[in-house]
């Protein structure tokens, strides 16, 4: 079974992906980890690779190809902003919540001010929206491709995991 989890920074995608991977006993493929691996292979910092990704689609395409290749080799939880668009999944999950909640989570996780996290999240989301539209003609704000959309501001980690597991069990 292939499950994709997408959502903006701070929405809880990694938390849900980790939880599903543990409960279901399947691997978790994180596009952020793929990005970090590419940076390490090229001897670049994450910031440097991010700037490079803004100059052309090559980096995004490498990540897409890696996810597709891993999906062909079996079941898993595939986490990433475009995972739902790139993979033929059995279940496509989108996590969302308000920017203020996400900024608060990011600030706590990365030990920075809420204002800084808010500013960085806005800038990142605007950059990603432009890139995805330009490179793929994807409107990242169009949620119509997702089977399940969960507002993680309404449920805690356990509640979000329970909702996702109920959807997965209903598929079988």
From Swiss-Prot:
Pfam families: Cytidylate_kin2. One of its GO terms (molecular function) is ATP binding. InterPro entries: Cyt_kin_arch, Cytidylate_kinase_dom, P-loop_NTPase. One of its GO terms (cellular component) is cytoplasm. It is found in: Cytoplasm. Gene3D superfamilies: P-loop containing nucleotide triphosphate hydrolases. It catalyses: CMP + ATP = CDP + ADP; dCMP + ATP = dCDP + ADP. This is Cytidylate kinase. The gene is cmk.
